[in-house]
């Protein structure tokens, strides 16, 4: 969008699924570039080894990545269809979702009726599972599997919405209008 190259990209033989998969691979590379040096610095300067948590950390972290992919795919579709202005809506949405994902506190802190909303979000399962792992030293596979199932559903829905928004953007001609 920012380089005004999207029109050229969408006229190429690139399939939408290939476009999305390339975005996902690039997100993993960017994540690795950011996370690996920071964890190594934390080990060196603070003697904090996040890798000591083991494989459960990888499973929960993958669930967070899947959640971010589903949201990112949905947002990409919105931006393709409606322009860069749609991005601000998503930033607002994220700040609204963060308290419901129970990042900083357990789900039980929320009012009872709001707990149902929180349990509909995959990050809630991840952070509750991480709390159980760090505080009680118990790996809650049920929470990880529940998060994974919700994430699979969200990814399927976000792929479908992206394809619908991309087709709508092609029909409306908004792919060539985006940019700086």
Placement of each model-derived feature along the sequence:
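Transmembrane alpha-helical segments of integral membrane proteins
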Residues: 125-136
